[in-house]
UniProtKB/Swiss-Prot annotation:
Residues 1-92 are annotated as: Disordered. It comes from the Eukaryota. It comes from Actinia equina (Beadlet anemone). Residues 1-6, 23-27, 44-49, 65-70, 86-90, 118-123, 140-164 form a propeptide. This is LWamide neuropeptides.
């Protein structure tokens, strides 16, 4: 490190972006400063700076923005399909309202046939009203509300050897 923080050494203002060092002054444009290359795994010296952890964080990375409200991986712009959870339950993260139809097994639009459980028993998840119609091994919360109940029983019943 240079003797004076203002000198133009490796740790000074002219530090080559892309190196792994940290500038002597947080306001200098070192790797950890304002010009940090998006995509690196470092953290900017100040949370408000557009470093990897700041506002310009690349969606798809596993980091978390310094502030939950910033559109980092955990923020509002979280890419649907990732396994993260948005910082706010109301944000359209993986677990939120805009959950993708096929990807989210735990959301309201759960695709019938998956093994997940919907967030609300009244929702049409695998464990909900439509389960017995699917013919899976569970029991629906409510009795089957369709007329072909007897036909379903015949199809789901184990055939006796005498009937074969």
């Amino acid at each position: 490190r240079s003797a004076d923080a203002q000198q133009h050494g490796l740790w000074g203002k002219r530090q080559n972006p892309g190196l792994w060092g940290r500038s002597a002054d947080a306001q200098q444009h070192g790797l950890w400063g304002k010009r940090q290359n998006p995509g690196l795994w470092g953290r900017s010296a100040e949370p408000g700076q557009p470093g990897l952890w700041g506002k310009r964080q690349n969606p798809g990375l596993w980091g978390r923005s310094a502030e939950p409200l910033q559109p980092g991986l955990w923020g509002k712009r979280q890419n649907p399909g990732l396994w993260g959870r948005s910082a706010d339950a109301q944000q359209p993260g993986l677990w939120g309202k805009r959950q993708d139809l096929d990807i989210g097994m735990w959301g309201k639009r759960q695709k019938a046939g998956l093994w997940g459980r919907s967030a609300d028993p009244g929702q049409l998840g695998l464990w909900g009203k439509r389960r017995s119609r699917i013919g899976l091994w569970g029991r629906s919360y409510e009795p089957p509300q369709f007329e072909d109940l007897e036909d379903l029983k015949k199809k789901s019943a184990i055939p006796k050897p005498s009937e074969q």
